[in-house]
Amino acid sequence: MNRFASNKKPKKTLSWSNTRIALLEHCERKYFLNYYTFALKQDFPDLRAETLLLKWLKSIEMRVGEKSHFLLSDYLHALKKWEITDEKIEELKDNMRREMKADFDYSKERDYSDREDFFGKFWLSEHFYGEEADSLLEPAIEKVCGNLDRFIASPWNEKVQDYFGSAKFVYVEHPRTPDFESMKVDVSKIWLRDVSVLAGPDFGVTFSDTDFLILDWKSGKEEVLDNTISDQLKVYALKMLLKKWFTSLNGIKIEAYEVYLDSMNSYGWILKQEDIDWIIEKINHDVEEQKQLLIDQNPYKNQPVDLMMFRKTTSDKKCEHCTFRDICQKLD
């Protein structure tokens, strides 16, 4: 009997994403706590409630990335409406400064009393664990605003303005209110059943029915890929193909880049058929790996095997900075 399983039917079937697979490879125990929290409800209701809270915690560094995406999206949506002036740019940055300060003050109160309603709450892991964080706020705000300044001063800003004026269609993500329905990938065409795949780029351009551009903004550590492009860009391209052309790039041009806001360096190229074939193979392989940690390997029921089957990382450094470090020790 699986003492960590819940009798309640999970809300979702098994899902795949690059983020989810990266977490599985990082630490299987953390993967369990992040995606199978419901399995703690029967035997560990208090720990389940605490785990739900911890899932909403983010470090201030992670919040910088999140807020950078918010601010750039705000700017691009205003630019798309031809509403951008120097005054408007300062207004957007001032709004973000106020938003980040208000969020920080809210987090600093450490009010975690409503343990069944964490959705949309802003909490910093530094505050939860009693770490000094006051000195981190202003540098974080300046980095977020600086990311926007660097984008505006870069050639990409001029290119984006040209796209708004000449392209057939331009998509700008709304990261504050993500549309999960529109993120769904039609995986039936790549032989997956009872598995959901979500993907949504930050910025997309349709030049014609056969010519596309995909951009993904990055605010973290710059990763230089030699002779390839990121898996995430490949997934975005696959999603686009699956909407109309199955999985063949024949006659279709999809150009994709990751743009690092800190340096404005970009990495990518025009997608090749081998990129599409490779990501299809990877998704199917990853799903098989995920299914090994499900009862009866059933992705529709999506019930995890016993917690102890989810191996903890052997890296002390990973554990030291893990959001779930206290919970993990209590479950051992």
Model-predicted regions and their roles:
Residues 1-332:
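RecB-family 4Fe-4S metal-dependent nuclease core
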